[in-house]
Amino acid sequence: MASLAAMSWPGILPDWSNLHVLHRNTLPPRAHFYSFADEDAALTFNREKSFFHSLNGTWKFHYDATPFEAPIWERANVTGWDNIEVPGVWQMQGYGRPQYTNIDYPFPVTPPNVSYMNPTGSYWREFEVPADWDGQQIRLRYEGVDSAFHVWVNGEEVGYSQGSRNPSEFDITDYLSSEKTNTLATRVYQWSDGSYIEDQDQWWLSGIFRDVYLIPFPRASISDFHVVPEVDDGYKSGTLRANVTIQGEDGDMSIKVLSPSGEVLDRWSGSSSDRYSKRVEGDDFQLWSAETPSLYTILIEFNGRTISQKVGFRRIEMSDSNFHVNGKPVIIYGVNRHEHNHLSGRTVPYEAMRADLVRMKRSNINTIRTAHQPPHPAFFDVADELGFYVIAEADLECHGFGNLEDTEEQAASWTSDNPEWTHAYLDRAKQLVERYKNHASIIIWSLGNECFYGQNQAAMYRWIKRRDPTRIIHYEQDREAESADIYSQMYSSPDEMREHMESHKDKPLILCEFAHAMGNGPGGLEEYIELFRSEPLSQGGLVWEWSNHGLLKKEGDLEYYAYGGDFGDEPNDTDFVMDGLTLSDHTPMPSLLEYAKIIQPVSVALTEDTKQMIVTNHYDFVDLGGLNASWHIVRDGDTTEAQRLELPRVPAGENRTVDLPLDKGALSQEAWLTVEFRLKEDTAWAEKGHVVAWDQLHLIGAAAKRSIPAVARDVAGLEVQQDRTKLRVKNGKSTLGFDLLQGNVTWEVDGVNLFQRGPELYFYRAMTQNDESSEGNMAEWGETKVGMMHTQVRDVAWKTSDNEIVVHFKVRVAPNVLEWGVEADLIYTIAAEEPLLRVRASGEFVGKNKPSVVPRIGFLTIMPEEFDEVRWFGRGPGENYKDSKQACRIGQYVAAVRELYTHYDYPQENGNREDLRWLQVSNGALTLDVRRVGESAPFSFTAGRYMPFDLDDAKHPHELQPLDMTVLNLDYDNHGLGSASVGPRPFEKYQCKTEPFDFTFELSLA
């Protein structure tokens, strides 16, 4: 009987599913640099003037469902292939589909195994090596490929690499042809064993998404260098040290050092085997910090090539349970930044990246965490230049294991505490540190994100500490900071932070993520910043995150920003990717303006006797000499001209008392002193006159009674008419109608229907994305049916006099099914003279299982859509809420109703304005004037074209259809925003509690 030979398939374990193969034939990681022909070219820092040959552009492309069906390069015929742009991800160019998950792996979880059904992109192009590169080593460099790839040159396999957000470099010299055009083929695999530790909260996107290029290295050349600017204990001098690594034979080398102003500080010549050092002191010595980003230039010449690097003197160390920069415990006012572009996904143009960092700087942000992987290398150059502290994070996250286990320890056993994965973890630490070690902006190395904690993080920590003792190390899920120099938490409340600091006094605490900026929110930022500035062990935090991650999706003539599920991707985490301070196109949202205001580096407050003001400098290093101060007065209908404010010197971290620049006794009505601080000179990130900080000080009492202009009106006394279910009150050309059955009110003036509905008691608003989370209030409000409440009239009484008519409704406002409700009195006073209508509402929440809080307490009024101009005196011009209003100044504003709407990528509650003294809504001919009555006169309002449930039902902006009406809400109170999408609900003082209420509005015609 014949026997069968043993057979197997695929025979050899594929590299992309083999934990023991991370790279094949790649060169060691090195500092990122370009080499130039001479010093002048090197000083441009322009890679186009260096020895550099870009392979970006149009490549041929073939897409397959599995690597086993991908073209075999020896027989491949690319003439029928598609074209694709490099850099770019293939999902944004018509292949496969984008997929968004926050935690879950979108593939079977059997690490390190990867399914053989693994989408694969085959790239091909021709290239020529510049003729003057003959005789040199030619390197092929990929700055970023997701998630793994093989490379062929002229049909011969060169090597393999993985680690999506880390560069890979190959020596292709021996594969090149001098007689013909060369071919380059790259096979990219969507998944690899590395995907298990690249489970970051972002879109899964694939392909060659960063630059590809050639660079020549002479046989004897600089292959790496490390510049260490050391700062002496007194922070008045330092030593610049450089260690240069040569491939090939050593030889003569020269080094030149230029000061921040470009003056030559040192010229040195010696052997490439020597170590260079230069003492810098006196006027030549300048410290680098986020506030003073002074950069020196080092030029290193060897064998006809010059490389250039910007370096900064700064010292990072642990001291007295804090981390210090240049001897001071700085506060992090930070933001997390993913690399994302709404048009191209993971491929971010340089101009877009720089624009982001400029906007961050203009928003008073001083720290960026490169969440959760290394960015494009040009990012660090810009951060050095503009002045940012950077937490540079390794390309590591395996959050998905947390959904498979009950404890973090169990989840860590998959990879983080598994010795089989140690090499993979260390590889990512080495890639990060070696490539970016020369950048002044990097003050902290981060071991990754949400990988739990185990022996592999400990191994990373030990390696980094040996390689680079000049920086500190961060890792949030090392709860006891065994392998980290600082404690780190996510989304803790201020009280939770205080509790931690009471029992952990050996190291400082930062929030590597806080204030989850999802949609309309976060609220309560002020409480965090107050804590950062008052508790020495609390050294700041980084808002999650910089921008929404919507991808522009086109469906015919329709364009919108898509999120998880919009591409048919399963599983997905829907809109959780929309959680930034900017919209998907990087337009600032109100939350960014709020953050910029609250973290501003200068603040002004009145002394207790209100006769002087205290100016506080929150900078860590600089005084206020770079700013011009001015002041002006804001009153109802009046703003004075700005005048210069003379300040004494206010050193960093200190305050000074300054006399008020005016006589308060001369003020006869409510007034606000506005103090502004503007740049004296242009900077790299803002022009002269840019407002860095401002404050408003309330100088005098409550708002004065607003004068309503007289309106000619035929007033023949008040007339009352009643039928079975209606009560009508006529006042000349004005008629108010009361529905005795349902409590509805109408108001008609000269044939114009001013009120189509209301004012009626109303307790609901549209949900925010924070409300909708599992920790938000939506569940409670849904269970208690707050949005389904309607008015039941219990009793109506009225009385008349010559000057007014008082209509008194006793009502119950309650949902169906449930027993709880609001017992209220609505008292309408109609007068013969202005104000024509006064509405008083008082009530209490009664019954079982009532909600603890409600979205709002106020009046809902429906007006014709012609009433589309709004004027108010209060906070503006943008939207603001009770726990997010510091960025909006008290003043007088005017806007069309459509301009009050905030265009969030995901429809939700928006457009509120707080602290109003008065409000006017007009159709051009007729104006309704509204104001509160009582001791706490300010109120809030929204005016728009949608009812709350319209916003609740829509999941994208294009699903909204504006109503032919103006929906006006006048609120006595409303619920804060909080950040419960991930984090705390609104703090107690910002909650709209179900407690007794009593408020009055006056409505007049102007």
Predicted segments — roles?
Residues W9-H23, F45, K60-D64, W81, ...:
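Accessory beta-strand-rich segments of carbohydrate-active enzymes
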Residues Q91-Q93, Q190, S289, P661-Q669, ...:
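Beta-strand/loop-rich accessory regions of lumenal/periplasmic or secreted enzymes
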Residues V153, K236-G270, K278, I298, ...:
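Beta-strand-rich binding/interaction modules
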Residues W133-Q136, L176-T181, E281-L295, A666-W672:
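Short glycine/proline/serine/threonine-rich loop/turn segments at secondary-structure transition edges
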Residues W9-F45, V86, Q93-G96, T101-P106, ...:
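Extended substrate-binding grooves/exosites of carbohydrate-active enzymes
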Residues D199-I222, L558-I614, H618-D638, P648, ...:
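Catalytic cores of secreted or luminal carbohydrate-active enzymes
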Residues Y123-R125, N166-F170, D274-K278, R656-L660, ...:
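Short strand-edge motifs at loop-to-beta-strand transitions and within beta-strands
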Residues M92-R97, D104-N113, Q162-S164, T173-G238, ...:
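An acidic-aromatic loop/edge-strand motif
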